[in-house]
């Protein structure tokens, strides 16, 4: 999700092998061009890349895993979340990495987090719990802080009730 320049493609390709499929999408044609160049140079025939915003995502087959890597605006969009859940199989793994505000005891540093992220995020004021719109649709939800509390890693599985919002 929001594959950018395709930096994660090599690791994803190693995980799924030649028989698996990788779908990547990004709404930035420049970023996607770099991802395409990376996949083409490596000869990965099982990597398909789509230029579209998450809110209009449509894939040829359901997916069994979703990776959201620093995609704050997608996590803040109910329509984007609905589209992601609609293309996911029941029980699909969802892994998320992102930025959030520091814990209260480091609150003065949140101005720095805000200033660092406001140019990249449409809703930087919503960095307290950026996962709060997708988490209710996931089971086995786990979250761990990173970067002294400024970042997070999260994991869950798509609930059966979350599917079917096409």
Language model features: what each stretch is:
Residues 139-166:
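Core SAM-dependent methyltransferase catalytic element
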Residues 121-137:
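Short alpha-helix
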Residues 17, 75-76, 88-89:
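Helix-to-beta-strand junctions that scaffold the AdoMet/dcAdoMet cofactor pocket
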Residues 56-66:
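A short acidic, Gly/Pro-enriched loop at the edge of an enzyme's catalytic core
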Residues 108-126:
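Conserved Class I S-adenosyl-L-methionine
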Residues 74-84:
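A short, conserved alpha-helix within the catalytic core of class I
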Residues 91-99:
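Conserved beta-strand signature within the Rossmann-like core of class I S-adenosyl-L-methionine
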Residues 1, 5-55:
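Class I SAM-dependent methyltransferase SAM/SAH-binding core
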């Amino acid at each position: 999700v929001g594959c950018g320049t395709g930096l994660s493609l090599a690791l994803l390709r190693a995980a799924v092998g030649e028989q698996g499929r990788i779908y990547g999408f990004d709404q930035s044609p420049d970023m996607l061009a770099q991802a395409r160049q990376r996949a083409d140079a490596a000869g990965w025939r099982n990597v398909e890349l789509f230029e579209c915003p998450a809110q209009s995502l449509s894939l040829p087959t359901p997916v069994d895993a979703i990776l959201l890597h620093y995609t704050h605006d997608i996590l803040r969009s109910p329509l984007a979340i609905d589209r992601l859940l609609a293309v996911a199989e029941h029980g699909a793994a969802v892994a998320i990495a992102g930025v959030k505000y520091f814990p209260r005891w480091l609150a003065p540093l949140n101005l720095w987090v805000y200033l660092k992220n406001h140019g990249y995020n449409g809703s930087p004021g919503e960095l307290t719990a950026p996962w709060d719109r997708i988490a209710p649709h996931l089971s086995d939800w786990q979250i761990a802080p990173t970067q002294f509390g400024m970042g997070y890693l999260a994991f869950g599985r798509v609930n059966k009730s979350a599917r079917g919002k096409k």
